[in-house]
Every structure is written in C-alpha cells, then in structure tokens.
Amino acid sequence: METFLFTSESVNEGHPDKLCDQISDAVLDACLIQDPDSKVACETCTKTNMVMVFGEITTKADIDYEQIVRKTCREIGFISDDVGLDADHCKVLVNIEQQSPDIAQGVHGHFTKRPEEIGAGDQGHMFGYATDETPELMPLTHVLATKLGAKLTEVRKNGTCPWLRPDGKTQVTIEYRNEGGAMVPERVHTVLISTQHDETVTNDQIAADLKEHVIKPVIPEKYLDENTIFHLNPSGRFVIGGPHGDAGLTGRKIIIDTYGGWGAHGGGAFSGKDPTKVDRSGAYIVRQAAKSIVAAGLARRCLVQVSYAIGVPEPLSVFVDSYGTGSIPDKEILELIKENFDFRPGMITINLDLKRGGNGRFQKTAAYGHFGRDDPDFTWETVKPLKWDKAQA
C-alpha cells in the first residue's frame, strides 16, 4: 500500500520566539484580569540581555510591564546569562501606545455597540482543522512533536535531566497512508530533538537521557520500530541558546501554534491579541467548528475557513472541505456549521468566554500549541453538540 512521509516541528517555551509569545500573552492576561474590555495588541522582541514590549494597548488596567517581563522569563528558567538571559538583570524596554482611534471607532464604536454589532478588528482569513487520527482530533505529527517539547521542559524543571537548559526544538516525521482522504499513521519514521544543554554533559548522555526520559514516555511503542531514525542533538553542541543564541519575536511560530503544517493557515498570529482581533478569535471558533464536525462522525477530516472585513461583524465567507471523508456532502456540512456557529466577533467572544483572564489563561496557549489541549480554559476545544433542522425533518 502506498504511503507518504509528513513532518511537524515544535519549539520549547525557552525558544526566543516562544518566550516573546508568552510575554505578549502574559501582558494580555494581566490586562483582561483588571479590564475585560481591554484592547491589546502587544508585541515582544528579545536579543542578548534585552527584552522589549511594544504595541497598542487601551485599558483601564494598571500594568507593570517590566514586572511581567521579568516574571515570565524567570518562570521559564532564564535566570542567568549562562542559559541565555538573566530575568532579573536584563534591560526591559517598553513602548506602548493607545489603540488607534480610527480602528477603535470602526470596531466597537467606543463601546456603544451591542456584542452582535461589534466589527472585526481587521480583515483576514482564518482556518480551523480537525482529523480523527488522535483522541485530540489533531494531527499525530504535531501532537508528538509538541508533547516531546513539553516533556523536555518537564524533565528539566523536575530535575530528572539537570543538564537541560530552556531552549529546544523537536520534530517528528510520520509515515502515513491515505484512506479515502483520511490520514492513517503507520509508524514514526524520524524523531529529531535539539536541546540546549550545559557544558558538563556528554553527547552520549544527552542521547541516552532523551531516549529514556523524553521519547519513551511520549511516543507510543507501536509507532517505533528498528528502522525509526533518531537525530538527537545532531549539531553536536547547543550550549548557547535562548535570546543569546537567536533573536526572538512574537508571532513567528504560527504553524507550531496551530496544526503543524496540516490544514491551512491564514497567516495571522495569536499571541498578545485580545478577542476583537479575529486572527485569534476567528481561528478559535473555526477550530471548534471543525472539531465538532469530526467528533460528530460527519467527516474524518475537516477544514473550515472564515474571512472578515475590518469593522464588519458578519463574516464575508465560510468554506468547508472534508477531503472526501464526509458522511454527508460538504454543502450540507457547511449549512450545519452556519446554523450552529456564530462567527461574529462579539458573539465568538461571548460564546467562548474570551474576555475572561486569570489562571494564566492565554499565556498557557503561548507554548505547546493552542489546539488539542485538555484544559477547561481552552473553551474552543469543547465539542459542540450540533443541531440540524434537516435531521429533524
């Protein structure tokens, strides 16, 4: 039977781009806790010994940006120059302005509009995807790459592998077969892990520890065989990492944040954006739509696209593709989605409770993926029971 290879990657919370995503979302969380109507577009960049937060924020919240930056860096493990950044001594630059009044009047009419009248914060198109190949209804390549990254962080923080440092990347290649449009994973072809480490550890110990403490607990044995290839720190040395090794910027890991290269992506990043930004809220609602279709058994794979114009509440278009796996025609799946999901930004915000801060809610999304997570704060992962007039007729 014909098979093909597909690959997804992930990066750890200590990767400089992901550090920036987490700082931007930590700022968003802080704003929403005090003022759920905060308008936030917070970017972060970092390089050796420096973190800068900048963007447009309109909020009644009293925010200590420097404290948020240092706390986030510290929690990730950036506690000395040796590991790539010193949370307590790095330079923190802040350049935050108010949201443009032109955008404000178009989007929410200075709070005079009812939720269903709130316009999209910008134009754009977003995609949601779901597949029946894992219990999370996510692609297995993405799930495994992401879980390997999370496990790396876990064994670093709990002391199992004390030689680990915060920065790291993972990548998984899987051999699939196409079963009438559905994706069926056959085996793991290649596992790649590149992790930052201290000076003391040997490459042999790195490889042994990664196999025992990271790969073994994460990748089900049934997918591994004698032909599976392992590339464990293939460059041979990764001591310098974090912002010391590479500059970081919010919004540069959008495929890791979503579906690992499966489905499609409209190009908009998530982190640091409040729910009036449809880059985020639109992508969340179409994930819920796609997931609900697959969970209901109406398709084995599903892609949903939505598009918006700035200041306009109603979406311009909604599109569905079941890749030929639908138990009913795509046209009917589309009708069903339109009947069951309200794509107006103000209504997405209410239905997914996106103004609620607290519990590090959005900061949690900023590492290890926004989708396929088992966490009540990820409201868009809730499968919605579908009402269908046609079925009752």
Swiss-Prot record:
Pathway: Amino-acid biosynthesis; S-adenosyl-L-methionine biosynthesis; S-adenosyl-L-methionine from L-methionine: step 1/1. K(+) binds at residue 43. GO terms for molecular function: ATP binding; metal ion binding; methionine adenosyltransferase activity. Binds 2 divalent ions per subunit. The metal ions interact primarily with the substrate. Can utilize magnesium, manganese or cobalt (in vitro). SUPFAM superfamilies: S-adenosylmethionine synthetase. L-methionine binds at residues 56, 99, 246, 277. Mg(2+) binds at residue 9. GO terms for cellular component: cytoplasm. It is found in: Cytoplasm. Its cofactor is Mn(2+); Mg(2+); Co(2+); K(+). The keyword ATP-binding applies. The keyword Signal does not apply. InterPro entries: ADOMET_SYNTHASE_CS (IPR022631), S-AdoMet_synt_C (IPR022630), S-AdoMet_synt_central (IPR022629), S-AdoMet_synt_N (IPR022628), S-AdoMet_synthetase (IPR002133), S-AdoMet_synthetase_sfam (IPR022636). ATP binds at residues 15, 167-169, 235-238, 246, 252-253, 269, 273, 277. It is an enzyme of class 2 (transferase). It catalyses: L-methionine + ATP + H2O = S-adenosyl-L-methionine + phosphate + diphosphate. It holds the Pfam family S-AdoMet_synt_C. Its EC number is 2.5.1.6. Keywords: ATP-binding, Cobalt, Cytoplasm, Magnesium, Metal-binding, Nucleotide-binding, One-carbon metabolism, Potassium, Transferase. GO terms for biological process: one-carbon metabolic process; S-adenosylmethionine biosynthetic process. Belongs to the AdoMet synthase family. Catalyzes the formation of S-adenosylmethionine from methionine and ATP. The reaction comprises two steps that are both catalyzed by the same enzyme: formation of S-adenosylmethionine (AdoMet) and triphosphate, and subsequent hydrolysis of the triphosphate. Homotetramer. This is S-adenosylmethionine synthase 2. It comes from Picea sitchensis. The lineage of its organism: Eukaryota, Viridiplantae, Streptophyta, Embryophyta, Tracheophyta. The gene is METK2.
